């Protein structure tokens, strides 16, 4: 008798800073330092980054941290084509807006990224699932995943579309916005919990509804153990980790947490001055780069699009002492 394990297929492999990165077709990522005694990773290229390609959106969310409106402008994507040609094959790019589906070049752009060996994904608002259904279906061949920002847990037509799109859909919820009445839409699904962003309309909304938002966050903390059992996967962005603290709530050991924690957006340098962050935020509408989408306005830096992607990683760290100050 012969037994053969079905192992995931290696799709990307590249060197970055002091380590090697391997990505498999099931989404698994393995990183190993060249020096087995090294206790942290350093980076010359971003491993992944968020990319805003439009400020246009008709959803009108009260907590939108990008201030997206119907008057928002689209990015000129031709200006940033060179940047992507300098990325390592296997770099993950999370495309958003605004409503990225409204960008007239979204299909060509995603196809271009794929042709370079990059791994694009896209985040959309649930409100746009039905109106942009055909475009989403076309995009699915060239994107690794789709994030759907939850707005209506009771819309059966929307969730039929989500089910049709398959296992690469992740439901996005915001700490402080998501409520217990929304939970049923999360059961059995992959979920990303985002921290509440206290900037732009998000700031105005927080001032008006501070007690409700804080109460929702506290309730989410209490319900997290139950959600962990009932959802297929739960992940967090850096702000979500800060606001919810799943390590403490779920009693995750230091060893287990360190194995899955991707690092803080603002832990930028080691003692030798090497870059220790793997991500950045690129605002292609305003041609600005920063550590994250919530960075202070005076720490968002202009770029031309003719730079090497590694230069933008360095630029995103300017003005900080390495501890986010």
Residue ranges and their predicted role:
Residues 36-78, 293:
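Canonical Radical SAM [4Fe-4S] cluster-binding loop centered on the CxxxCxxC motif
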Residues 48, 66-75, 89-103, 113-132, ...:
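Core AdoMet radical
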Residues 60, 97, 285-286:
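Residue-level recognition of short loop/turn positions
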Residues 78-86, 107-111:
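Ankyrin repeat (ANK) tandem alpha-helical domains that serve as protein-protein interaction scaffolds
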Residues 141-285, 289-307:
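Radical SAM enzyme [4Fe-4S]-AdoMet core and its adjacent flexible, acidic
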């Amino acid at each position: 008798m012969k037994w053969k394990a079905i192992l995931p297929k290696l799709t990307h492999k590249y060197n970055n800073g002091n380590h090697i990165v391997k990505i498999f077709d099931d989404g698994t990522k393995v990183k190993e330092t060249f020096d087995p005694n090294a206790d942290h990773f350093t980076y010359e290229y971003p491993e992944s980054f968020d990319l805003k390609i439009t400020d246009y959106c008709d959803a009108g969310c009260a907590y939108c941290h990008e201030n997206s409106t119907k008057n928002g402008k689209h990015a000129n994507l031709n200006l940033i084509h060179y940047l992507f040609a300098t990325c390592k094959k296997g770099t993950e790019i999370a495309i958003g807006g605004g409503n990225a589906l409204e960008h007239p070049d979204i299909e060509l752009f995603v196809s271009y990224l794929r042709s370079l060996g990059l791994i694009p994904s896209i985040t959309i608002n649930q409100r746009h699932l039905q109106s942009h259904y055909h475009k989403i279906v076309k995009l699915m061949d060239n994107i690794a995943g789709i994030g759907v920002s939850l707005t209506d847990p009771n819309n059966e037509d929307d969730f039929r579309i989500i089910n049709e799109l398959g296992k690469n859909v992740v439901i996005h919820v915001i700490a402080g916005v998501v409520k217990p009445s929304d939970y049923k839409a999360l059961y059995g699904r992959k979920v990303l919990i985002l921290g509440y962003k206290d900037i732009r309309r998000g700031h105005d909304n927080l001032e008006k509804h501070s007690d409700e938002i804080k109460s929702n966050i506290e309730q989410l903390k209490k319900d997290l153990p139950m959600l962990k059992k009932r959802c297929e996967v739960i992940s967090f962005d850096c702000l979500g980790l800060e606001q919810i603290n799943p390590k403490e709530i779920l009693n995750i050991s230091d060893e287990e947490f360190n194995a899955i924690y991707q690092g803080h957006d603002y832990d930028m340098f080691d003692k030798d001055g090497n870059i220790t962050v793997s991500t950045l935020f690129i605002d292609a509408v305003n041609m600005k780069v920063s550590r994250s989408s919530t960075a202070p306005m005076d720490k968002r830096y202009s770029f031309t699009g003719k730079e090497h992607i590694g230069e933008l990683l360095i630029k995103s760290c300017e003005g900080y002492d390495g501890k986010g100050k």
